[in-house]
Amino acid sequence: MYIAVPNILHVKYTRAALEAGRHVIVEKPMAPTAALAEELAELARSKKLFLFEAVTTQYQDNYAKIREVLPKVGAVTMVQCNFSQYSSRYHDFCAGKVWPSFDPACAGGALMDLGVYNVSYVVGLFGSPNKVHYAANITRGIDTSGVLTMEYRSFKAVSINAKDSSSPARYIIQGTKGYLLQKSTANFCGGVTFHPYKGKEEHFNLSAGRPRQAAEFHAFARAIESEDMELCSRMLDTSVAVSRVLETARRDAGIRFATDL
């Protein structure tokens, strides 16, 4: 079952589907809090059902290639992510009409809508950060844009997400031997170039010509058909970790949802 409803309803419908014995693919973000994400993950495991969060980033061929070539950059020192996309609904929001994507009652906002891709990108490569800080532009209780900082033991990751403005997408992983540059948003995960400080540049684009959601749904189908619960469990762990970063970040910025305890 594929669940694509406003963010605040993801948990309700996912829980109901799992209780009914259905495998579930739920749109990102899986849940508005880490506790609720953990609840869904444990429910799926207890019933031996597949539960996947539909976040395209981590299933793209280029993302797998980034993980493969990452050691070439040397010791990672900085990571930059920018997913800024002016929303067609922002004008309505400014005029007082609120769509779910800009409604705190629906668990909306730039972080939950776009930032989730950046966080998934970073956490999927490096695991959970040690510290999180979110400086957001907030209007009527919701973030229309913001800058998220994730601190790791030996490097910092910065994520910009915006629905009130646009900019070119940039994903850069900087290291002591070179850097990886990607000029597309994390949901597409387009071509990547490795720029070594010594030697020739290397470019790869393994996802060219494929629909954006093709890789993830092929992965879901293969996992279910082959009963690959190990993959499902591993991806659920990542989804819970991403949910924890998102929750910590928005709480840090003073953004509250109805599901918060």
Residue ranges and their predicted role:
Residues 1-42:
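Beta-loop-alpha module in the N-terminal Rossmann-like domain of NAD(P)-dependent dehydrogenases
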Residues 2, 219-261:
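C-terminal helix-rich "cap/oligomerization" subdomain common to oxidoreductases
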Residues 26, 51-53, 182:
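Hydrophobic residues in well-ordered beta-strands that form the structural core
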Residues 28-29, 54-57, 83:
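Short strand-turn motif at the edge of the Rossmann-like AdoMet-binding core
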Residues 39-57, 75-78:
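Rossmann-fold dehydrogenase core element
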Residues 58-130:
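Predominantly a Rossmann-like dinucleotide-binding segment in NAD(P)-dependent oxidoreductases
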Residues 118-189, 207, 218-226, 260:
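Contiguous beta-strand/loop segments that form the cofactor/metal-binding neighborhood of enzyme cores
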Residues 205-218, 234:
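Active-site loop of classical SDR/Rossmann-like NAD(P)-dependent oxidoreductases
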